[in-house]
Amino acid sequence: MSEEQHPDTGLRGMVVPVTPLQQNCSILWCTTTNKAAVIDPGGDLDNILGAVEQNGVELEKILVTHAHIDHAGGVAELAERLDLPIEGPHPEDQFWIDRIEESGSKYGINARAFEPNRWLDGHDTVTIGEQTLGVRHCPGHTPGHVIFHHAPSQLAAVGDV
């Protein structure tokens, strides 16, 4: 796990490698409120929750860049376990969400389909505590891939683009 602070921007972050593919799941939090979001919880939820606890932050939502198994395999379970809303990806990734259980079986990842509380589009914003991140729709890797950009820190959570 690695932690990064963006001075004077109100945002801190940590990367937690998850799944057999060692995908980078991110935890971002507002330093004013200690409210946090987990981005792309592909699996290994106990590791993710351990990092959340270690940093003394409170998860308020799940953000999803795209619905490939290594990025979204743990979304349904985490949302259910902690009663968290799911934001993202773009609706064009519905096909991948519908197939996530089948995809997971190929990698030994138990996954379930999920329904986002909020689909995201290219000009939306999301909040983490008092921090606002812009959303950009970046189709290519998947048709519904989105990225999250925090302008004050110049940090971008880009999934696989």
Give residue ranges: language-model regions.
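Metallo-beta-lactamase
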Residues: 102-103, 115, 125, 131-161
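Conserved beta-strand hairpin/beta-sheet module of binuclear metal-dependent hydrolase folds
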Residues: 3-55, 147-161
